[in-house]
């Protein structure tokens, strides 16, 4: 049984806990969040506006969050180096604050006594691994890894199938992305991104994203061939990747569909999914796949030029991959 701690009990931290508690072999024994008291942690875990009420018993005391009778120790330390991970025999820390994404900052958990760290977001300095794409390259000597971003986890499996089967000459990605906690409820200051400071619930907001660039980190053969942007839209969850691709050789849309369907039933089962149904975004709430290819939504202009569409629950699907990475790291 791998002993796990979660640092940061926000959207991803709480959903990761929901998923981890259903996995055999993972024991979440501690949570740290300096901004949340135990009673508030219990409330936020129990009630979720997007994914619904937790189907179980949630209580707390002065020291613990108690879920279905299981006590999870709670701490409120600002500096990860001050956490008692050694005293708690923590094997892996899930770094979910969005603050300690740099490798040297995440290593504070190791200073505190943990053995390894999985960062729930892209990192400029820690190696990134995407399930189904390059996770087979992970080696046990690597102590800090990044699980990349929700959008990278959607795009990378799709891009890998396309690259392996047809060769990508160049590609542009747009993600139509649900609003997140970094956005504003009303117009407010956002010095680095003026548009990002506009009211999230009233606007479609063009934005930058590092997701496409991150894909080239896990698929180096696409370096210089892929970039992208985002549109933030007023939905609470579920996003969709729009990928426009120029292939290196002629291909039919049926061949593209067949290759993706084959991968979804084979080496990428559980990661990449395939549908021909007339779906919309809410159909994917709670979906644990990284990427769900929408075969009936794509279009083709010429034998080498196509637009492909793939959905993802940017909260639940990504959180499922975080837990997968914990399992990978624990077994390596």
From Swiss-Prot:
Query: What sections of the sequence does the record tag as coiled-coil?
Result: none
Give me the residues that bind D-glyceraldehyde 3-phosphate, please. 149-151, 180, 209-210, 232
How would you classify this enzyme at the top EC level? oxidoreductase
Q: Please state what the protein is called.
A: Glyceraldehyde-3-phosphate dehydrogenase 1
- Disulphide bonds annotated for this chain are none
Report the EC number(s), separated by commas if there are several. 1.2.1.12
- Site note Activates thiol group during catalysis, residues: 177
The protein's GO terms of the molecular function aspect are: glyceraldehyde-3-phosphate dehydrogenase (NAD+) (phosphorylating) activity; NAD binding; NADP binding
Q: What does the record give as the reaction this protein catalyses?
A: D-glyceraldehyde 3-phosphate + phosphate + NAD(+) = (2R)-3-phospho-glyceroyl phosphate + NADH + H(+)
**NCBIfam families documented for this protein:** GAPDH-I
Q: Which InterPro entries match?
A: GlycerAld/Erythrose_P_DH, GlycerAld_3-P_DH_AS, GlycerAld_3-P_DH_cat, GlycerAld_3-P_DH_NAD(P)-bd, Glyceraldehyde-3-P_DH_1, NAD(P)-bd_dom_sf
Please verify whether the record's keywords include Transcription regulation.
Answer: no
> What GO terms in the biological process aspect are recorded for it?
glucose metabolic process; glycolytic process
- Where does this protein act, in terms of pathway? Carbohydrate degradation; glycolysis; pyruvate from D-glyceraldehyde 3-phosphate: step 1/5
What species is this protein from? Candida glabrata (strain ATCC 2001 / BCRC 20586 / JCM 3761 / NBRC 0622 / NRRL Y-65 / CBS 138)
């Amino acid at each position: 049984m791998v002993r796990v701690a979660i640092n940061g009990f926000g959207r991803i931290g709480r959903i990761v806990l929901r998923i981890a508690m259903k996995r055999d072999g993972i024991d979440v024994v501690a949570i740290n969040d300096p901004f949340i008291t135990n009673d508030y942690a219990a409330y936020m875990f129990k009630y979720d506006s997007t994914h619904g009420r937790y189907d179980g018993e949630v209580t707390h005391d002065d020291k613990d969050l108690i879920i279905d009778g299981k006590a999870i120790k709670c701490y409120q330390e600002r500096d990860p180096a001050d956490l008692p991970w050694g005293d708690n025999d923590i094997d892996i820390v899930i770094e979910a604050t969005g603050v300690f994404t740099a490798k040297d900052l995440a290593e504070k958990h190791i200073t505190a006594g943990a053995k390894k760290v999985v960062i729930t977001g892209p990192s400029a300095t820690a190696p990134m691994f995407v399930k189904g794409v390059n996770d087979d390259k992970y080696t046990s000597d690597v102590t800090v890894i990044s699980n990349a971003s929700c959008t990278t986890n959607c795009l990378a499996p799709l891009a890998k199938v396309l690259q392996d089967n047809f060769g990508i000459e160049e590609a542009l990605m747009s993600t139509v992305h649900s609003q997140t906690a970094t956005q504003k409820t009303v117009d407010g200051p956002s010095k680095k991104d003026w548009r990002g400071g506009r009211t999230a619930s009233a606007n479609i907001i063009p934005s930058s994203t590092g997701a496409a660039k991150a894909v080239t980190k896990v698929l180096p053969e696409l370096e210089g061939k892929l970039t992208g942007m985002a549109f933030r839209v007023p939905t609470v969850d579920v996003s969709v990747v729009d990928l426009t691709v120029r292939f290196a050789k002629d291909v039919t849309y049926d061949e593209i569909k067949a290759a993706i369907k084959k991968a979804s039933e084979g080496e990428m089962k559980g990661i990449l999914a395939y549908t021909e149904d007339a779906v919309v975004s809410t159909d994917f709430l709670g979906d644990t796949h990284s990427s769900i290819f929408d075969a009936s939504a794509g279009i083709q202009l010429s034998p080498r030029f196509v637009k492909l569409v793939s959905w993802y629950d940017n909260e639940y699907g990504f959180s499922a991959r975080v837990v997968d990475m914990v399992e990978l790291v624990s077994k390596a």
